[in-house]
From Swiss-Prot:
Entry's family note: Belongs to the class-II aminoacyl-tRNA synthetase family.
Protein name: Histidine--tRNA ligase
Superkingdom to which the source organism belongs: Bacteria
Organism name: Micrococcus luteus (strain ATCC 4698 / DSM 20030 / JCM 1464 / CCM 169 / CCUG 5858 / IAM 1056 / NBRC 3333 / NCIMB 9278 / NCTC 2665 / VKM Ac-2230) (Micrococcus lysodeikticus)
Stored CDD domains: HisRS-like_core
Length: 458
């Protein structure tokens, strides 16, 4: 991870690093499918109008154009396109907005509630830094309903993510949960109608601190010092159980939307507290910057690595996807896979047992044995044992060094006994043990069959 990318913000993994990423993706996929989520993939490009319908991300979007089109504009043969043309194509910056479009276009072919997972590259024109890249992989789960969606799914998706993250070698993590209705109802209850502006300011709390947020609330939202103090008092509430309800009510603010949000959040937190103890807290400072969230919102941090920011976030959206009078409310969470893997590698949180899939290297001492060596490898592969064959005869020592350099645990030798009959032996180059083996039935230990990714020893 100390290598410098030739193109800033676009990471390329070495084989051992890629194995760690693949382990993360495989673990997530397996967990998602155990919970009944179906995998899909959407196109890499959307129209600019589709991407910018919700949220303030226009400066982060990569627009797409044909090189020939740019040349025609430069030559004066056609007018340049309006940069803000809603029909212009651009790379998607997340998977939620494309998924909303996918649901609308395919609603007649989907069974609702529709449970989907999606793992793809996304692109954002951000300033590259630790934990932030311009091209990165996300892994999303969402449940979408037709017309309505039970609030129980808000807890369901969080439990799935808690299980998925708990299966990874990343140590402790914490899912921080809030509710937009609770926050917006509170702000309106204290007389602040620009709830979106308040949320944007509160969303900066961990980066700039309470004094700066108080200033932003007063200068940009028009809050009085007392209103700013009340908004910050709400954001200061954090509990591991439903006791946050009493603490909010103790602030003396009333509003119908506030009560609705309190009830929804209490139900989610109670379920998480019961089924995933120690994995989640109610944290009323969580705002989430995107405008399409309408209820429960989540952010997840690695304990001890909070400065990395959220590795998994999302929430409830009731109006992101619609078709005429038909509305498709949903709730989902997204893991920043690249961000997570970058931290796993840089902090040596997990390591791959080897950098290649090969378990057995079939050595050659005579070039005329190459075809027979291929037969040995074929027998091994038929039983699911990854094997490769030397392309030319060399001294055993050189071939063992080659296997060791690549991390291949076993070397297969073909020889002949005193009577000239073919004999086979396999050597564990880590321990030096060598014994007779039959290519038709020999199997390596289960832990050596494929590369293993495990939490590094402290």
């Amino acid at each position: 991870m100390s290598r410098k990318a030739s193109l800033s913000g676009f990471h390329e993994w070495l084989p051992a690093e890629r194995l760690v990423e693949q382990h993360v993706l495989d673990t997530l996929r397996r967990t998602f499918e155990l919970h009944g989520f179906a995998g899909i993939e959407t196109r890499a490009v959307e129209t600019l109008g589709q991407l910018l319908r919700k949220g303030e991300v226009d400066k982060e979007v990569y627009a797409v154009s044909r090189l020939a089109e740019d040349e025609e504009v430069a030559a004066g043969r056609r007018e340049p396109k309006d940069p803000a043309d809603p029909k212009r194509l651009a790379l998607h910056f997340d998977l939620t907005v494309p998924f909303a479009r996918y649901v609308v276009e395919n609603a007649g072919h989907l069974a609702f509630p529709f449970r989907r997972y999606q793992m793809q590259k996304v692109w954002r024109g951000e300033r590259p830094q630790e934990g932030r890249a311009r091209e990165f992989t996300q892994a999303d789960i969402d449940v979408v309903g037709d017309g309505a969606l039970s609030p129980r799914y808000d807890a369901d998706v969080a439990l799935v993510m808690a299980e998925a993250l708990g299966a990874l070698p990343i140590g402790d993590f914490l899912i921080r949960v809030n509710n937009r209705k609770l926050a917006e109802g509170f702000y309106r209850g204290i007389g602040l109608e620009d709830t979106a502006g308040v949320l944007r300011s509160i969303d900066k709390l961990e980066k700039v601190g309470p004094e700066e947020v108080a200033r932003l609330l007063q200068e940009e939202v028009g809050a009085s010092p007392e209103q700013a103090a009340q908004a910050l008092a709400l954001a200061d509430i954090r509990t591991s159980d439903t006791s946050f309800v009493e603490r909010v009510r103790a602030l003396g603010v009333t509003h119908e939307l506030l009560e609705e949000g309190l009830t929804e959040l209490a139900d989610v937190v109670a379920t998480l507290h019961r089924r995933a103890p120690g994995r989640a807290v109610a944290d009323l400072s969580i705002a989430r910057g995107l405008d399409y969230y309408t209820g429960t919102v989540y952010e997840t941090v690695l304990v001890g690595h909070e400065q990395l920011g959220s590795i998994c976030s999302g929430g409830r959206y009731d109006a992101l996807a619609s078709k005429g009078n038909r509305v498709f409310p949903g709730v989902g969470l997204s893991i920043g896979v690249t961000r997570l893997v970058m931290r796993m590698l840089s902090q040596q949180m997990a390591v791959a047992s080897r950098s290649v899939p090969t378990a057995v290297y079939v050595a050659l001492t005579a070039d005329e044995d190459w075809s027979e060596a291929q037969d040995v490898a074929a027998l091994l592969r038929e039983r699911g044992i990854p094997a490769e064959v030397a392309v030319s005869a060399e001294k055993f020592g050189r071939q063992i060094k080659y296997a060791d350099r690549r991390g291949i645990p076993f070397v297969w030798f073909m020889g002949r006994d005193d009577a000239g009959a073919r004999v086979h032996e396999v050597k564990d180059i880590r321990s030096g043990e060598q014994h007779a083996a039959d290519p038709a039935d020999w199997t390596p230990p289960a832990e050596d069959l494929l590369p293993q990714v495990a939490r590094a020893q402290d």
